[in-house]
């Protein structure tokens, strides 16, 4: 819920659950010493106002950072916090991190309520048959059949690509459709009328209200 809390923090996850999100999405990066942390960007300048590249620093260095009561969080902490109360989408930002993310998910018994998603087909292909996966994309064409070939359970198109034709095609291939990022309640309503199975939003409360 970045509209109310800083994205990719434990506070934002807790708030998302409290306001009724069915699934929480977080982004995964890895530190120099191999710790999986939550962050959309490799650099923390946008979120924590410090010019620090996560992949060049250790977790010991990162965990000391703080901004307005927020601190960087490890994926392990996020999985513990959610604990299966809702589903989780873990977006893998670097192709080489897929195996480490799955290993942690499995070690924490979270595989039943977690899906690993990525823009990178090679990540999804390597995870095939081991966990629920989804292909994220912002450019057509070909992504829906590619997701099917990769063994995905879902596709995550940029919302402008979630046309009626695309949604129907994905459903014919037995793929769920989750469109991103939809912060206008009326646009969310339109997408659900089109048949999408879910939308990623920064405003869970507003979207839920529009769908009542």
Model feature map: region roles:
Residues 1-212:
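Phosphate-group recognition and catalysis centered on beta-loop-alpha active-site segments
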């Amino acid at each position: 819920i970045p509209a109310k809390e800083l994205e990719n923090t434990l506070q934002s996850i807790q708030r998302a659950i409290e306001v009724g999100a069915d699934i929480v999405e977080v982004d995964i990066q890895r530190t120099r010493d191999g710790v999986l942390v939550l962050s959309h960007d490799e650099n923390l300048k946008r979120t924590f106002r410090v010019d620090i590249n996560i992949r060049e620093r250790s977790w010991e260095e990162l965990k000391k950072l703080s901004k307005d009561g927020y601190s960087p969080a490890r994926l392990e902490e996020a999985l513990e916090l959610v604990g299966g109360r809702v589903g989780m989408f873990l977006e893998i930002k670097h192709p080489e991190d897929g195996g480490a993310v799955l290993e942690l998910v499995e070690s924490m018994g979270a595989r039943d309520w977690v899906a690993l998603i990525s823009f990178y087909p090679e990540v999804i292909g390597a995870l095939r048959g081991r966990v629920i996966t989804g292909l994220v994309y912002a450019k057509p064409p070909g992504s829906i059949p590619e997701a099917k070939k990769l063994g995905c359970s879902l596709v995550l198109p940029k919302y402008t690509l979630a046309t009626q034709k695309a949604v129907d095609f994905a459903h014919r291939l037995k793929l769920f459709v989750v469109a991103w990022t939809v912060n206008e309640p009326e646009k969310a309503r339109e997408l659900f009328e089109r048949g999408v199975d879910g939308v990623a939003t920064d405003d869970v409360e507003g979207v839920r209200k529009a769908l009542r």
